[in-house]
Amino acid sequence: MVIGLSHYLTVSAILFTLGVFGIFLNRKNVIVILMSIELILLAVNINMVAFSSFLNDIVGQVFALFILTVAAAEAAIGLAILVVFYRNRGSIAVEDVNMMKG
């Protein structure tokens, strides 16, 4: 059995759906929301690499590496902000984060 484009798109659609459900169904934990955003970015990367490989073009794969770099930086900065917020407030609930003054 050959793994084709439709298999990659199916896996990507499942990951994207899990990420969207994670954001909409969990409104209390910021870490789970951050992980759901990472799942969505991973699904987009799988799509880009699958189409790039299917079309024999390297540009999509290079762009996917840039997206992974941005996602890693976003996760690191987001977790650092959450650690500082937890030290100051003692909680990382979404309701507490919404009360921040800007």
UniProtKB/Swiss-Prot annotation:
Protein location: Cell inner membrane
Entry's Gene Ontology cellular component terms: NADH dehydrogenase complex; plasma membrane
Keywords from the named record: Cell inner membrane, Cell membrane, Membrane, NAD, Quinone, Translocase, Transmembrane, Transmembrane helix, Transport, Ubiquinone
InterPro entries: NADH_UbQ_OxRdtase_chain4L/K, NUOK/Mnh_C1-like
A GO biological process held by the record: ATP synthesis coupled electron transport
Descriptive protein name: NADH-quinone oxidoreductase subunit K
TM region positions: 5-25, 31-51, 65-85
EC number: 7.1.1.-
Pfam hit, one: Oxidored_q2
Highest taxon, organism lineage: Bacteria
Subunit composition and interactions: NDH-1 is composed of 14 different subunits. Subunits NuoA, H, J, K, L, M, N constitute the membrane sector of the complex.
Underlying gene: nuoK
Bilayer topology term: Multi-pass membrane protein
Family: Belongs to the complex I subunit 4L family.
Primary subcellular site in the record, as a coarse category: membrane
Cited function: NDH-1 shuttles electrons from NADH, via FMN and iron-sulfur (Fe-S) centers, to quinones in the respiratory chain. The immediate electron acceptor for the enzyme in this species is believed to be ubiquinone. Couples the redox reaction to proton translocation (for every two electrons transferred, four hydrogen ions are translocated across the cytoplasmic membrane), and thus conserves the redox energy in a proton gradient.
Organism: Rhizobium leguminosarum bv. trifolii (strain WSM1325)
Gene Ontology MF term list: NADH:ubiquinone reductase (non-electrogenic) activity; quinone binding
Top-level EC class as recorded in UniProt: translocase
Reaction(s) this enzyme catalyzes, per UniProt: a quinone + NADH + 5 H(+)(in) = a quinol + NAD(+) + 4 H(+)(out)
